[in-house]
Amino acid sequence: MANWTQEDGAPTPVTNPSEVSQVSGGSVTGGPAVTSCLIPSFAEAVKLLKARYSCLVLDTHRRHISLPPVHLKKKKTGIQEQLNAELLKYSNSLDGVPVAYDNIKVVGQHGNIYDDQGFIHFNIEASFVIFRPKNGSRLMGVINKMGASHVGCLVHGCFNASVMKPNALTSDQWRDSGLCVGQSLEFEVFQLDADAAGVLLIRGRLDRSRVQELVAQFEQKQVTAESSTEADATEDTTDSPKPKKKKKRKKDKNDTESSMEECVNNSSLQETSEHHQTTTEEDCSANGRHKEKKKKKKRDKNDTESSMDECMNNNSLQETALDTTEEDCNANERHKEKKKKKKRDKQQDSAEIVPTSDSSGYISDKTSRKRALEAGDDTETPAAKKKKKSK
């Protein structure tokens, strides 16, 4: 197993990881597909180690490999295929994302076969360039996409990162911030994540100093724009162009003619307005007189009707008063007659009960009448006596 000689007809081993897409184009069964992203070579990755804000680390790592039986005669090719499939994918054992590898060594002379499995198990050791960003670390990327809320960047040509828009900037300011596609951008990492396939997701934000610079730039632009508008307004008001003398004369003539026409028009308008006022005043006075006459007629009619109503009311009141007085008089006379009848009846009874007589025993009507008259009231009227005589 430690023999690295290749048999006749066997493919040559891959020395550059960038050639993986050409050599292992999915011919190996059971192996994962190779990513389409551009993978840097080991030499290029080593050069990037010295770059600022690269977050790349060179580390020698030992790991376990299980080769299928198809790679018994081409062991190195099988190892390279497995390692190439793990590039640019997050690895827990490496605590990062492997970018490139080199210097593969087999630990031990022989491999092992466990039980009835067909895979050959052995350990290898290699040098890996690992991408290990942390929260708070800074990265340099190249802008490849401009959005309303973020900017897409490509770090080391193979890692996607999205830089979010600062809250201090509006969408218009973010659009006019001067960022464009192809420009390098420095940002700070604040979130790292990996999906089920192991693809690393990076979220970043601009540095505070850069945000302050952008805000200051926009404020300065706004101030300059306001000052320029004010200056333009003052120039328009103060620095008016001086016309020529000929134009002035023409303008003066036109002004005098227009003023004369205006005076004539104003005088005609005044005359027409005065005439209209006089006519309107006459019409108003005539209408007022006619209305006053109508009002007088209405007043006279109302006065006559009211006087007639008063007379009628007075007559009715007098009639009712007379009726009431007559009824009262009749009632009083009847009451008096009743009283007189009662008195007469009493007198007649007393005359019948107590007859007067002489010493000789003769009874005369005169004495009884006199006594009756003396005993009666003095209030009797002579009319009553006449009535008795008539009876």
From Swiss-Prot:
Spell out the Basic residues composition-biased ranges: 288-299, 336-345
Protein name per UniProt: DNA-directed RNA polymerase I subunit RPA43
UniProt biased composition (Polar residues) = 312-323
Cite the residue spans of the region called Disordered.
1-27, 220-391
* Matching CDD domains: RNAP_I_Rpa43_N (cd04328)
On whether Lipid metabolism is a keyword of this UniProt record, the answer is no
- The record's gene field reads polr1f
- Where is this chain's protein located in or outside the cell? Nucleus, Nucleolus
Its chief place of residence is: nucleus
Highest taxon, organism lineage: Eukaryota
Q: Which GO terms describe its cellular component?
A: RNA polymerase I complex
Keyword Coiled coil appears in the UniProt entry: yes
Which key words are in the record?
Answer: Coiled coil, DNA-directed RNA polymerase, Nucleus, Phosphoprotein, Transcription
Q: Of which family is this protein a member? A: Belongs to the eukaryotic RPA43 RNA polymerase subunit family.
Functional note: DNA-dependent RNA polymerase catalyzes the transcription of DNA into RNA using the four ribonucleoside triphosphates as substrates. Component of RNA polymerase I which synthesizes ribosomal RNA precursors. May be involved in recruitment of Pol I to rDNA promoters.
Q: Which residues form a coiled coil?
A: 289-353
Q: Which Pfam families match?
A: RPA43_OB, SHS2_Rpb7-N
Biological processes annotated in GO: DNA-templated transcription initiation; transcription elongation by RNA polymerase I
Oligomer and partners: Component of the RNA polymerase I (Pol I) complex consisting of at least 13 subunits.
Gene3D superfamilies in the record, alphabetically? 2.40.50.1060, RNA polymerase Rpb7-like, N-terminal domain
